[in-house]
Amino acid sequence: MAIKTYKPTSPGRRAQTCSTFEEITACKPERSLVENLKKSGGRNSNGRITSRNVGGGHKQKYRIIDFRRDKTEIPAKVATIEYDPCRSARIALLNYADGEKRYILAPLSLKVGDTVISSEQADIKPGNALPIRCIPLGTIIHNIELKIGKGAQLARSAGTFAQLMAKEGKYGQVKLPSGEVRMILMDCKATIGQVGNVDHENVSIGKAGRSRWLGVRPHVRGVAMNPVDHPHGGGEGRTSGGRHPVTPWGIPTKGYKTRTNKRSTPFIVKKRTK
């Protein structure tokens, strides 16, 4: 994948960059693997805003992704590499030998015609899924489970990867994209390789309207609000807020640790660095 730039025909075009989509091989998804997706506008079932700055955006169809990789010992051939509007990574359509079709996240260097498999005896090559106990130390992995059989939850965004650092008892130590080293059960599955579309982080949105297409609404600074709306609001003329930075609910922010202890805390070997 490469980044496409534009001639500065307008202020919005000047800073805008875009993916070339050269790895995409199909323009329409597999109909049996898509669902309707209803937008929430950041509201919960009571109609109250639980996620600010969310709303609008282009209509999307949700692609059903196989995060469990539970179809074991059956090889599958990569039929297409496709765009997915619901995530930053590309997706790959697999045709299994028994006729079933499934989508997976497309790893870097996976091509149409390649064969992948989910198996304990699978080769260590991009796209193959194995339990962590069957993966050699130092291997680059993604799409990692936290609970056995629940489906992958870690390292799923474009360009991300984790690394298997050690094995001890029934746990493997995995270094995550944040720098955190975490213990994960050996029987949890992971996929070999790095998630594709690595240049996604280099794409420049370029203009406010393009963010609106993605369903992102404007983020208003607290100092620009009234006192009724934010602790930093109010004051005569332009002010700095007059206090240490806080959230709209008065909780310190910008470096203040807010993570509470959880049942999973003992499994963190090293805290994140980012």
From Swiss-Prot:
GO cellular component: large ribosomal subunit
Region (Disordered): 224-259
Record bears the keyword Oxidoreductase: no
One GO MF term attached to the UniProt entry: transferase activity
Transmembrane segments: none
Any one of the GO BP annotations: cytoplasmic translation
Keyword entries, A-Z: Ribonucleoprotein, Ribosomal protein, RNA-binding, rRNA-binding
Coiled coil: none
Domain of life: Bacteria
Known function: One of the primary rRNA binding proteins. Required for association of the 30S and 50S subunits to form the 70S ribosome, for tRNA binding and peptide bond formation. It has been suggested to have peptidyltransferase activity; this is somewhat controversial. Makes several contacts with the 16S rRNA in the 70S ribosome.
Subunit annotation: Part of the 50S ribosomal subunit. Forms a bridge to the 30S subunit in the 70S ribosome.
PANTHER family: LARGE RIBOSOMAL SUBUNIT PROTEIN UL2M, RIBOSOMAL PROTEIN L2
Family, as annotated: Belongs to the universal ribosomal protein uL2 family.
The protein, known as: Large ribosomal subunit protein uL2
Protein source organism: Geobacter sp. (strain M21)
Organism phylogeny: Bacteria, Pseudomonadati, Thermodesulfobacteriota, Desulfuromonadia, Geobacterales
Gene behind this protein: rplB
